[in-house]
């Protein structure tokens, strides 16, 4: 007899607000591989329950009722496809080289990446069509190495959007990126603002979308396949931006719980402003953690618990979902989106300039976004993973040339 609940953690989260959405934060191509990996950890009745849950998460034959309503991906996440299905993609890349003998490694990487996006998009087309274009989008990111190159981002966006009607273009939260988002919105192209961590970024994005929509409506552009989401990379703000270190620099000790509260405060405020000002963009929560550790040793996932009830997209990577399944089945949710941050915590956080810049609408100007510590660190990580994809295809290119 198992104590595992029939409804999964994520299904119970959506019960609090059915308008919220769960997205898969990886390529759909590897979903079945991941399912098998998770099921290996379980046995008996527990395994059967989780198997049913995962069938409800992604079920192309019952797309309207499946849990996953969309997908986020990028070159970094697409590297997982090469790693998990290595031999298949080696053969695929070899085929690309045969068809394009003059292609270089950068061109080869881009063509392989587009193929991964295209195949993932096809897997969500049934949902896209049956939902009348409300759901079923797959976010495809422009190359993270060109986040300050407006022309290059626009060029890549135009290529990516041609792959499938349900492709949503992921654009970084730089000054140039927001200019691109405005242009894409004016053309009726769905966008996802990524590499974004702080309220000033979210507001610049929301206003860029608003201005782009005004142009689109003036020009009678078809907006039936348009959506806008604004990503908040929650734990990356605190961890990769080193909020604790920024506090120590001025003599303030911040606990892991304080850091989580900081991240929650930012997204709660963004959610409230978008709602009050009736912006059409929807906040997307990502980079969530099983955290903080509690005194009674119970598992906490504040990034979900403390914002439950909000009208969010929660995009969840395989590793995070696996942790929820294996370690967090007792988690329960209540509507906490309108509950305030503990005043003592907020007072302490507001003494730290790194947090104040993130929490105030005018805490940073657009020219400063590209230098934000979390932007710099995350862009570097994504770029390194992109180089991983390039190295993968480069190895195949060199092997072909040596034969």
Predicted regions: what they are:
Residues 20-26, 45-52, 69-73, 136-142, ...:
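Hydrophobic faces of well-ordered beta-strands that scaffold small-molecule active sites
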Residues 37-45, 54-87:
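An N-terminal structural lobe/cap that precedes and organizes the functional/catalytic core
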Residues 65-68, 75-176, 180:
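Active-site beta->alpha loop and helix N-cap motifs at the rims of alpha/beta catalytic domains
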Residues 1-53:
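N- or domain-start disorder-to-order transition segments that initiate the globular core
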